């Protein structure tokens, strides 16, 4: 403020001196300076003085703006830094709420730097979730050491021969957890499932887990089998009950395909596209099976084929070591005649597992792509006949192929033996007449134009 006043006085001094001089010289004015001679009257000189005053005032205003420019720029930078710091703080709180420890610590450090508060990162780190600490049991050596110091030293033992001092070493063998269920437990569970006693089967699983006869993985799979088998039964009094049981089966074992397929088919039949696609994205990392894509195919029939290709390529990237995602992406690329993309995905699938559908698609690419080789197409046709069949519902006990999953195999009555897997060529003779033709041909999600 003082600087502005000094500048204003400097600019106003000539005006004040000129005004005093003009008050002493009324009428015409003559100005002589360094040989220059100017004759004028009072109005003209007053106008000149006014112009000079306006120029000095503008210069004063400009100098004030220039002087305030660094402070304004600094305040603007501080405001931007404060805004970024608050955004990083909110992101750190969101990461803490979602349980993402890595992102939470990164945003907390950024917020502490931008807000110039070193203690903020430590306070936010205390909000992040931490795994529960495992109780550390005292070792045998520590327990023995405590007992040693608790006792008073007694008299020394009498001397004995060295041979008598050697004690036999006894190694205690710890009871290992069973690798799989025993035959008795398997028969007990199978009997309840065959009889349709779903509630009794669930109760028996809980008792077996408490008794230590079942591992958590086996218990989760058997619980999911019982719930999905119960969901497949007709419930005329409660139409929503099968879907509810299927969702419970999914929650019990996320790696079990039948309940996930059950729920996705229900969402597709109701036309709930967003729910079905969300469920597919959550299930695909655990069970990337082609049958899930076949179930969602009605939702994508009217969509752009390029959009479908992008979706399937994203699914293939989620499970890059499973062939079904690459096969579906290759088939979608074949439908829009993107030969390079189709070759890349199909060859990735064939490197993982030889498949008849993949060989057939490669033969068609060689036949339709400009510059393709007829000889290569013939080679792929021969490999198609030599490759394994496409995945199907196969009973692991009797090697029969069935049309749909069931808790009990309709052929051998095996419980929890039907899985979605690739069947070998030799089992074609074991197929029932109704399923032989259907299992040899894989449904196509896309048709080339």
Curated annotation (Swiss-Prot):
* InterPro entries registered for this protein in UniProt: HemY_N, Mms48, TPR-like_helical_dom_sf
Q: Where are the transmembrane segments?
A: 40-60
Q: Signal peptide position in this chain?
A: 1-18
Q: What induces it?
A: Part of the probable mms6 operon.
Write one Pfam family the protein is assigned to. Answer: HemY_N
Consequence of gene loss (knockout): Normal magnetic response, fewer, larger magnetosomes; cells accumulate 20% more iron. Deletion of the 4 gene operon (mms6, mmsF, mms36 and mms48) gives an intermediate magnetic response with fewer, smaller magnetosomes in irregular pseudo-chains.
Report keywords, A-Z: Biomineralization, Magnetosome, Membrane, Signal, TPR repeat, Transmembrane, Transmembrane helix
Q: Give the source's domain of life in one word.
A: Bacteria
User: Where would I find the TPR repeats?
Assistant: 323-356
Output a single Gene Ontology CC term carried by this record: magnetosome membrane
Misc: This bacteria makes up to 60 cubo-octahedral magnetosomes of about 45 nm in diameter which contain membrane-bound crystals of magnetite (Fe(3)O(4)).
Q: Which protein is depicted?
A: Probable magnetosome protein Mms48
Name the source organism: Magnetospirillum gryphiswaldense (strain DSM 6361 / JCM 21280 / NBRC 15271 / MSR-1)
């Amino acid at each position: 403020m003082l600087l502005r006043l000094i500048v204003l006085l400097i600019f106003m001094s000539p005006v004040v001196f000129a005004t005093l001089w003009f008050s002493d010289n009324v009428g015409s004015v003559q100005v002589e300076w360094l040989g220059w001679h100017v004759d004028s009257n009072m109005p003209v000189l007053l106008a000149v003085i006014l112009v000079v005053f306006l120029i000095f005032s503008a210069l004063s205003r400009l100098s004030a703006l220039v002087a305030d420019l660094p402070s304004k720029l600094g305040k603007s930078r501080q405001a931007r830094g404060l805004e970024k710091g608050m955004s990083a703080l909110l992101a750190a709180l969101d990461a803490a709420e979602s349980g993402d420890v890595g992102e939470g610590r990164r945003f907390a450090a950024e917020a502490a730097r931008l807000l110039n508060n070193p203690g903020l990162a430590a306070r936010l780190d205390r909000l992040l979730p931490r795994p529960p600490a495992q109780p550390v049991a005292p070792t045998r050596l520590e327990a023995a050491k405590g007992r040693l110091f608790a006792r008073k030293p007694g008299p020394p033992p009498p001397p004995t021969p060295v041979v008598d001092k050697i004690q036999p070493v006894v190694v205690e063998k710890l009871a290992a957890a069973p690798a799989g269920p025993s035959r008795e437990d398997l028969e007990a569970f199978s009997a309840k499932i065959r009889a349709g006693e779903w509630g009794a089967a669930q109760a028996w699983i809980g008792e077996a887990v408490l008794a230590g006869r079942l591992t958590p993985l086996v218990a989760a799979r058997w619980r999911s089998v019982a719930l999905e088998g119960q969901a497949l039964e007709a419930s005329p009094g409660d139409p929503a009950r099968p879907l509810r049981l299927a969702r419970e089966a999914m929650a019990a074992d996320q790696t079990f395909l039948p309940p996930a397929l059950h729920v996705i088919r229900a969402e597709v039949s109701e036309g709930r596209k967003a729910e079905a696609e969300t469920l597919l994205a959550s299930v695909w990392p655990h069970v990337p099976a082609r049958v899930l894509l076949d179930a969602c195919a009605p939702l994508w029939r009217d969509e752009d084929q390029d959009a479908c290709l992008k979706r399937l390529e994203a699914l293939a990237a989620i499970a890059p070591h499973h062939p079904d995602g690459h096969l579906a992406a290759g088939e979608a690329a074949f439908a829009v005649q993107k030969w390079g993309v189709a070759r890349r995905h199909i060859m990735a699938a064939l490197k993982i597992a030889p498949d008849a559908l993949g060989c057939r698609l490669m033969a068609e690419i060689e036949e339709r792509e400009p510059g393709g080789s007829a000889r290569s197409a013939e080679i792929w046709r021969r490999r198609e006949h030599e490759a394994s069949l496409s995945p199907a519902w196969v009973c692991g006990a009797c090697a029969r192929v069935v049309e749909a999953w069931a808790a009990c195999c309709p052929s051998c009555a095996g419980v929890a033996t039907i899985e979605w897997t690739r069947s070998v060529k030799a089992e074609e003779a074991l197929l029932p007449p109704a399923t032989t033709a259907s299992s040899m041909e894989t449904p196509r999600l896309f048709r080339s134009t």
